[in-house]
């Protein structure tokens, strides 16, 4: 991955990463939009893939990933909401994805899917829906680069944050910190769904370090059409000293 490696979170403050979700971007101007979020200070491009099987919506595929890859230098963070998942992993890796995350319910063999992602040169993430238990991490956390906790039920952008997920964030943070303290690999803790300037501080305090925001970013452009203002406000609010 050519940017942004996992951070242990040690030190005076945890590293904060912002990952605008292009699901909320203007698709008629998608190239301009991804350039604008990078110029505005985004750390990742979050790329939601839905297949109308695992979730009841249909979005974008590898061709779109391939098209935006030359336009940005920041990593592309692909979230696969598809079933079955394994066939698409090589396609997105070839298209330029840097991180690929999937839902355990969409894989017949979770460990094998994690290995497939890593074999194709990408960072591997596991996505847990609001009702999916953290026990999925019992035998996978030491192989992951990213845990993505959904704070809405996946399928559509613009949903409200589910407050009950905060306790799950705290528990996941404790698991990651224990692994790192024991000499294990650092893992990003990403949150996706209803993240906004007025709740990101609370989410960061619970332990998240990587924040997916869709409508909160793309619905609040600067006067010049850029996103420096909202990304700065989100980063400031998420920075816990």
Swiss-Prot record:
Name assigned to this protein: Ribulose-phosphate 3-epimerase 2
Residue numbers binding a divalent metal cation: 46, 48, 79, 192
Top-level taxon of the source organism: Bacteria
Family statement: Belongs to the ribulose-phosphate 3-epimerase family.
Keywords: Calvin cycle, Carbohydrate metabolism, Isomerase, Metal-binding, Plasmid
E.C. number: 5.1.3.1
InterPro entries: Aldolase_TIM, Ribul_P_3_epim, Ribul_P_3_epim-like, RibuloseP-bd_barrel
Disulfide links within the chain: none
One of the GO BP terms on file: pentose-phosphate shunt
Pathway this chain belongs to: Carbohydrate degradation
């Amino acid at each position: 991955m050519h940017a942004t490696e996992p951070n242990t979170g040690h030190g005076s403050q945890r590293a904060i990463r912002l990952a605008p979700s292009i699901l909320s971007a203007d698709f008629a101007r998608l190239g301009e939009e991804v350039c604008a979020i990078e110029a505005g200070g985004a750390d990742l491009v979050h790329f939601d893939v839905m297949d109308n099987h695992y979730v009841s919506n249909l979005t974008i595929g590898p061709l779109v990933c391939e098209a935006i890859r030359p336009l940005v230098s920041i990593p592309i963070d692909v979230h696969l909401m598809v079933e079955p998942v394994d066939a698409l992993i090589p396609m997105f890796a070839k298209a330029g994805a840097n991180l690929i995350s999937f839902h355990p319910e969409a894989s017949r063999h979770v460990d094998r899917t994690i290995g497939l992602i890593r074999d194709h040169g990408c960072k591997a993430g596991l996505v847990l829906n609001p009702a999916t238990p953290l026990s999925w991490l019992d035998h996978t956390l030491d192989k992951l680069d990213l845990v993505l906790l959904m704070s809405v039920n996946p399928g559509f952008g613009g949903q409200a944050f589910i407050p009950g997920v905060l306790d799950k964030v705290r528990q996941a943070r404790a698991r990651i910190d224990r692994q790192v303290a024991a000499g294990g690999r650092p893992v990003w803790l990403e949150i996706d769904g209803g993240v906004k300037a007025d709740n990101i501080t609370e989410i960061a305090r619970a332990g998240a370090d990587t924040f997916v925001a869709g409508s909160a970013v793309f619905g609040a452009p600067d006067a010049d059409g850029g996103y420096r203002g909202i990304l700065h406000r989100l980063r400031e609010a998420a920075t816990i000293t």
